[in-house]
């Protein structure tokens, strides 16, 4: 057994960092030997030694720093170079990869969660890891993502086919980055979508009055309601449905 005096934080952290690097390479799809039992035990042992004999707070801080650096140095550049649908696909992919990374990495450091964080009342490793994405990636990309989704919804309203699964996956990014609440979804996407919806149907109503017969005009609102219900079913959050129907589509009055 290694004596406490022989344990050095830098050595143990290097073992943990080595395992993290392998995880990153695996998630990035790079050629990498399997993340095997030996590596997992090495990370578990290093975590135990740091928590038992050294400075668990330092390990906690290093964990956050490592994930933040990955988000800033790898994830953000991959998103900044893409636009529109390509950017949306990358964002959804990166969010899913980040969740996987946090889950796998935090499991290797579970002793830190159990022996230190729970006693100190600090956020869990999972929470810290997910917050790194929210603070470093989501915060920068959410505005562009919302605009790209609204552009797709506009295309669909105009009769074009869109990738609804993609839209739903990116909507999940908004919802899940609320960390248990709908705050991000409501403030960063839904609010803009409702404004865009009102503007769209206000413009449409003006044209319908001029171009459609009285009978056709009275049928338009119900047709639009049905299509908006379908959008909620396929990719919007269920709580959006009543808000959509409260939107006054310009001069369209539901009689």
From Swiss-Prot:
Domain of life: Eukaryota
Organism of this sequence: Arabidopsis thaliana (Mouse-ear cress)
Name the UniProt record assigns to this protein: Cullin-like protein 3
InterPro entries with a match to the protein in the record: Cullin (IPR045093), Cullin_N (IPR001373), Cullin_repeat-like_dom_sf (IPR016159)
Gene Ontology molecular function: ubiquitin protein ligase binding
Pfam families according to UniProt: Cullin (PF00888)
GO BP terms in the entry: ubiquitin-dependent protein catabolic process
Family: Belongs to the cullin family.
């Amino acid at each position: 057994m290694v004596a406490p005096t022989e344990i050095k934080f830098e050595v143990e952290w290097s073992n943990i960092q080595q395992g993290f690097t392998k995880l990153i390479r695996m998630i990035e799809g790079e050629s990498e030997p399997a993340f095997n039992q030996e590596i997992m035990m090495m990370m578990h042992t290093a975590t135990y030694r740091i928590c038992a004999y050294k400075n668990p707070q330092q390990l906690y801080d290093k964990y956050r720093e490592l994930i933040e650096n990955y988000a800033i140095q790898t994830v953000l550049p991959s998103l900044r170079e893409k636009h529109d649908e390509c950017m949306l696909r990358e964002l959804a992919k990166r969010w899913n990869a980040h969740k996987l990374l946090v889950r796998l990495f935090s499991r290797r450091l579970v002793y830190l969660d159990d022996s230190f964080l729970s006693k100190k009342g600090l956020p869990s490793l999972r929470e810290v890891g997910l917050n790194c994405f929210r603070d470093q990636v989501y915060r920068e990309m959410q505005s562009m993502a919302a605009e790209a989704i609204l552009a797709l919804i506009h295309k669909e309203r105009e009769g074009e086919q869109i990738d609804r699964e993609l839209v739903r996956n990116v909507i999940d990014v908004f919802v899940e980055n609320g960390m248990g609440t709908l705050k991000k979804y409501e403030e960063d996407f839904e609010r803009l979508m409702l404004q865009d919806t009102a503007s769209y149907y206000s413009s449409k109503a003006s044209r319908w009055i001029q171009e459609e017969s009285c009978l056709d005009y009275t049928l338009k609102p119900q047709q639009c309601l049905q299509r908006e219900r379908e959008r909620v079913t396929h990719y919007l959050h269920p709580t959006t449905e009543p808000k959509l129907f409260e939107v006054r589509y310009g001069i369209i009055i539901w009689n």
